């Protein structure tokens, strides 16, 4: 989906975000497990921008630290004073002074704009009429808080007006300004230099470049977007609303792709969750980041899954927890109140209940009895437990790592295993049972005499 013409992106992320009431920068709050800014960068990635410039301000250290972790090459510049969106974009000039292509302006708190929409916005600059500015427009359910765009029948802008300044006729228009726009670099910088701050807020507003272009007899146009794509986040309630919107869309996509969600509204996905066909997901299941679920899997209620790779025809839960590094092979079973971390459960193995498996490999066809614990941490280091194929681990066993249980071996219930067990061997590591005849009766009699 690479853009046909050279382009650069400017992402505005300098706002203080005070309405979030948080020590975390607003654009680093997570939507479906990924920071808001990460969504914007991810939408740009398939378009291969020549440059991506993030304009930071308040809390810039947090933003810059995050940018060091992303794959897309990004330059950050700083808006020292919060003097408006036009002033913020102007701070990117130093990073783009030699760039001759198109520039798209995006917002770090508007996370869901799609790559195809950004591409359409940029391509509109190169239609036959060669507009100076292309503005992303939308029609919200409640347009009262948005500025209006007055256009002719060919989507050429005639006027842009804030709601408070609009006439009754203009307020009846439902086409609104998202704030996102595309413009050629050689047009942007001169127009920005002409923006004035003679308004109630004393700020320099980016949309003013549209009216400046129109005043010079140049053209500006709109490109339509769905309202959900340009929904922004200013507070936690809006973040929750956007999370709900995204989750609903994801649930619909998962079901369209062939999975069954018994109670869709109770299942929560992350941005990168992959679900195969003929998967059944019961109510109240949570997917954290980096989860892949293959075809034919059943996930029972109240399971919590993150960082896990689940292969075909596996059964999970109910009340199972899969943590990062869990690899569950074909036809394995992970039952209720089982926790798996950094472990591989091989084909057909069963871990049915009340068990912790960490830093381990469970061989194909093995059975892990209820109450089994892999004791993988000695207070300083993690060690591994290796269990061979078709081994049987009796209930309430403690496997003290590092330790290897051979293929076909049997561990007697209640054992604490501290040494390797050879293949096909029986290991018993518990005190020998001793029965004392009539001891209980005598004990009760003594107690009654007191």
UniProtKB/Swiss-Prot annotation:
<dbReference type="GO" id="GO:0000902">
    <property type="term" value="P:cell morphogenesis"/>
</dbReference>
<dbReference type="InterPro" id="IPR025877">
    <property type="entry name" value="MobA-like_NTP_Trfase"/>
</dbReference>
<feature type="binding site">
    <location>
        <position position="234"/>
    </location>
    <ligand>
        <name>UDP-N-acetyl-alpha-D-glucosamine</name>
    </ligand>
</feature>
<keyword id="KW-0961">Cell wall biogenesis/degradation</keyword>
<keyword id="KW-0133">Cell shape</keyword>
<feature type="active site" description="Proton acceptor">
    <location>
        <position position="353"/>
    </location>
</feature>
<feature type="binding site">
    <location>
        <position position="79"/>
    </location>
    <ligand>
        <name>UDP-N-acetyl-alpha-D-glucosamine</name>
    </ligand>
</feature>
<dbReference type="GO" id="GO:0009245">
    <property type="term" value="P:lipid A biosynthetic process"/>
</dbReference>
<feature type="region of interest" description="Linker">
    <location>
        <begin position="237"/>
        <end position="257"/>
    </location>
</feature>
<keyword id="KW-0677">Repeat</keyword>
<feature type="binding site">
    <location>
        <position position="430"/>
    </location>
    <ligand>
        <name>acetyl-CoA</name>
    </ligand>
</feature>
<dbReference type="GO" id="GO:0003977">
    <property type="term" value="F:UDP-N-acetylglucosamine diphosphorylase activity"/>
</dbReference>
<feature type="binding site">
    <location>
        <position position="26"/>
    </location>
    <ligand>
        <name>UDP-N-acetyl-alpha-D-glucosamine</name>
    </ligand>
</feature>
<feature type="binding site">
    <location>
        <position position="162"/>
    </location>
    <ligand>
        <name>UDP-N-acetyl-alpha-D-glucosamine</name>
    </ligand>
</feature>
<dbReference type="GO" id="GO:0008360">
    <property type="term" value="P:regulation of cell shape"/>
</dbReference>
<feature type="binding site">
    <location>
        <position position="356"/>
    </location>
    <ligand>
        <name>UDP-N-acetyl-alpha-D-glucosamine</name>
    </ligand>
</feature>
<feature type="binding site">
    <location>
        <begin position="84"/>
        <end position="85"/>
    </location>
    <ligand>
        <name>UDP-N-acetyl-alpha-D-glucosamine</name>
    </ligand>
</feature>
<dbReference type="InterPro" id="IPR029044">
    <property type="entry name" value="Nucleotide-diphossugar_trans"/>
</dbReference>
<dbReference type="GO" id="GO:0005737">
    <property type="term" value="C:cytoplasm"/>
</dbReference>
<dbReference type="GO" id="GO:0016020">
    <property type="term" value="C:membrane"/>
</dbReference>
<dbReference type="GO" id="GO:0006048">
    <property type="term" value="P:UDP-N-acetylglucosamine biosynthetic process"/>
</dbReference>
<feature type="binding site">
    <location>
        <position position="323"/>
    </location>
    <ligand>
        <name>UDP-N-acetyl-alpha-D-glucosamine</name>
    </ligand>
</feature>
<feature type="binding site">
    <location>
        <begin position="107"/>
        <end position="109"/>
    </location>
    <ligand>
        <name>UDP-N-acetyl-alpha-D-glucosamine</name>
    </ligand>
</feature>
<keyword id="KW-0511">Multifunctional enzyme</keyword>
<comment type="function">
    <text>Catalyzes the last two sequential reactions in the de novo biosynthetic pathway for UDP-N-acetylglucosamine (UDP-GlcNAc). The C-terminal domain catalyzes the transfer of acetyl group from acetyl coenzyme A to glucosamine-1-phosphate (GlcN-1-P) to produce N-acetylglucosamine-1-phosphate (GlcNAc-1-P), which is converted into UDP-GlcNAc by the transfer of uridine 5-monophosphate (from uridine 5-triphosphate), a reaction catalyzed by the N-terminal domain.</text>
</comment>
<protein>
    <recommendedName>
        <fullName>Bifunctional protein GlmU</fullName>
        <ecNumber>2.7.7.23</ecNumber>
        <ecNumber>2.3.1.157</ecNumber>
    </recommendedName>
</protein>
<feature type="binding site">
    <location>
        <begin position="376"/>
        <end position="377"/>
    </location>
    <ligand>
        <name>acetyl-CoA</name>
    </ligand>
</feature>
<comment type="similarity">
    <text>In the N-terminal section; belongs to the N-acetylglucosamine-1-phosphate uridyltransferase family.</text>
</comment>
<comment type="pathway">
    <text>Nucleotide-sugar biosynthesis; UDP-N-acetyl-alpha-D-glucosamine biosynthesis; UDP-N-acetyl-alpha-D-glucosamine from N-acetyl-alpha-D-glucosamine 1-phosphate: step 1/1.</text>
</comment>
<keyword id="KW-0460">Magnesium</keyword>
<feature type="binding site">
    <location>
        <position position="177"/>
    </location>
    <ligand>
        <name>UDP-N-acetyl-alpha-D-glucosamine</name>
    </ligand>
</feature>
<feature type="region of interest" description="N-acetyltransferase">
    <location>
        <begin position="258"/>
        <end position="450"/>
    </location>
</feature>
<dbReference type="GO" id="GO:0009252">
    <property type="term" value="P:peptidoglycan biosynthetic process"/>
</dbReference>
<keyword id="KW-0012">Acyltransferase</keyword>
<dbReference type="GO" id="GO:0071555">
    <property type="term" value="P:cell wall organization"/>
</dbReference>
<keyword id="KW-0963">Cytoplasm</keyword>
<dbReference type="InterPro" id="IPR005882">
    <property type="entry name" value="Bifunctional_GlmU"/>
</dbReference>
<comment type="similarity">
    <text>In the C-terminal section; belongs to the transferase hexapeptide repeat family.</text>
</comment>
<dbReference type="InterPro" id="IPR001451">
    <property type="entry name" value="Hexapep"/>
</dbReference>
<dbReference type="GO" id="GO:0019134">
    <property type="term" value="F:glucosamine-1-phosphate N-acetyltransferase activity"/>
</dbReference>
<keyword id="KW-0548">Nucleotidyltransferase</keyword>
<feature type="binding site">
    <location>
        <position position="341"/>
    </location>
    <ligand>
        <name>UDP-N-acetyl-alpha-D-glucosamine</name>
    </ligand>
</feature>
């Amino acid at each position: 989906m690479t853009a046909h013409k050279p382009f650069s992106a400017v992402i505005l992320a300098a706002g203080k975000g005070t309405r979030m009431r948080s020590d975390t920068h607003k654009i680093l709050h997570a939507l479906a497990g990924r920071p808001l800014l990460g969504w914007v960068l991810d939408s740009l990635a398939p378009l291969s921008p020549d440059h991506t410039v993030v304009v930071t301000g308040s809390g810039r250290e947090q933003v810059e630290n995050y940018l060091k972790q992303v794959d897309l090459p990004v330059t950050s510049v700083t808006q020292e004073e919060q003097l408006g969106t036009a002033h913020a974009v102007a701070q990117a000039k130093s990073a783009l002074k030699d760039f001759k292509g198109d520039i798209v302006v995006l917002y770090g708190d508007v996370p869901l704009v799609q790559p195809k929409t950004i591409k359409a916005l940029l391509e509109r600059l190169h239609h036959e009429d060669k507009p100076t500015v292309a503005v992303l427009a939308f029609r919200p359910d409640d347009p009262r808080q948005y500025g209006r765009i007055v256009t002719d029948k060919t989507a050429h802008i005639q006027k842009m007006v804030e709601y408070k300044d609009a006439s009754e006729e203009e307020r009846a228009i439902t086409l609104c300004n998202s704030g996102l726009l595309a413009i050629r670099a050689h047009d942007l910088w001169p127009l920005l230099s002409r923006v004035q701050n003679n308004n109630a807020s004393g700020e320099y507003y980016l949309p003013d470049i549209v009216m400046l272009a129109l005043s010079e007899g140049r053209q500006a146009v709109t490109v339509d977007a769905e309202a959900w794509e340009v929904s922004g986040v200013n507070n936690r309630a809006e973040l929750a609303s956007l999370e709900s919107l995204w989750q609903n869309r994801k649930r619909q996509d998962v079901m369209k792709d062939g999975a069954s969600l018994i109670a869709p509204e109770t299942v929560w996905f992350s941005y990168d969750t992959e679900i195969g066909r003929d998967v059944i997901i019961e109510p109240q299941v949570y997917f954290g980041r980096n989860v892949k679920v293959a075809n034919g899997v059943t996930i029972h209620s109240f399971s919590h899954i993150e960082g896990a790779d689940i292969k075909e025809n596996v059964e999970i839960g109910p009340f199972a927890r899969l943590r990062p590094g869990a690899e569950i092979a074909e036809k394995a079973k992970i039952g209720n109140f089982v926790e798996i971390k950094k472990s591989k459960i091989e084909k057909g193995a069963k871990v049915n209940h009340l068990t912790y498996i960490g830093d381990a490999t469970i061989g194909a066809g093995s059975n892990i009895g209820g109450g089994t614990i892999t004791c993988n941490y000695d207070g300083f280091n993690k060690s591994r437990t290796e269990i061979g194929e078709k081994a049987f681990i009796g209930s309430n066993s403690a496997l003290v790592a590092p330790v290897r249980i051979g293929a076909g071996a049997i561990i007697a219930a209640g054992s604490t295993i501290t040494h390797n067990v050879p293949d096909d061997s029986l290991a018993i590591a518990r005190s020998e049972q001793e029965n004392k005849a009539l001891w209980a009766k005598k004990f009760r009699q003594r107690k009654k005499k007191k």
